[in-house]
């Protein structure tokens, strides 16, 4: 993990050092990955160049504490809204900017730590924000935060079941048995290719978490 990344040149330099290290130790070149932590305004401004600077990039990580200091945010509680700001989420643009770059360059988006290790409600609230946007995970600083992080970044059982039902229904509808249609009704919901893509995201998260489906798809009677 490379902290306080500000530009692509820092990634390129680290890539070169890792290549030398791999060759010296007889390792496959490219085996070692890079996680870039965005902790200041300059890093956020250059995030597209950072994300695309090396094929070693595996994730973009938000570093909230140093970032808050770098933009003079008036808060002493890492990850919480600054006092007096009541018109929305002060972190929304930052999180979305990191997420957009991560998705554009096919790397993971990881939310940074929540320092109130005894404030589990606060951790749940802040983790829920980035999980809802589509982040892949969040740093945990204390064992008590791990279970909550796994919970927040895994889909609810009903959402996981529904995603698998959508995939099954769409696969059936587009097959010859289902009439090779481009859309189909699942209950009161019309599902199509866009629905399938959305379901794939939820399904993948559920499968990665080891979830088991509790519903099965039954093709409608012809």
Please describe what each predicted stretch is:
Residues 1-222:
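Expand to "…catalyze enediolate/carbanion chemistry for C-C bond making/breaking, isomerization
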């Amino acid at each position: 993990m490379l902290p306080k990344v500000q530009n692509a040149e820092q990634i390129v330099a680290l890539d070169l050092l890792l290549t030398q290290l791999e060759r010296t130790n007889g390792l496959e070149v490219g085996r070692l990955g890079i996680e870039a932590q965005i902790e200041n305004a300059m890093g956020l401004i250059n995030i597209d160049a950072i994300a695309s600077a090396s094929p070693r990039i595996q994730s973009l990580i938000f570093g909230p504490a140093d970032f808050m200091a770098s933009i003079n945010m008036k808060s002493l509680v890492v990850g919480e809204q600054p006092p007096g700001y009541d018109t929305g989420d002060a972190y929304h643009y930052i999180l979305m900017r990191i997420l957009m770059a991560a998705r554009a360059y096919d790397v993971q988006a990881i939310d940074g730590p929540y320092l109130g290790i005894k404030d589990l409600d606060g951790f749940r609230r802040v983790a829920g924000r980035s999980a809802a946007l589509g982040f892949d995970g969040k740093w945990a600083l204390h064992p008590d935060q791990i279970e909550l992080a796994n919970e927040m970044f895994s889909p609810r059982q009903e959402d996981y079941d529904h995603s698998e039902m959508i995939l099954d229904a769409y696969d059936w509808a587009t097959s010859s048995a289902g009439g090779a249609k481009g859309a189909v009704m699942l209950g009161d919901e019309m599902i199509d290719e866009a629905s399938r893509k959305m379901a794939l995201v939820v399904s993948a998260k559920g499968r990665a978490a080891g979830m088991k489906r509790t519903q099965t798809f039954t093709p409608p009677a012809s």
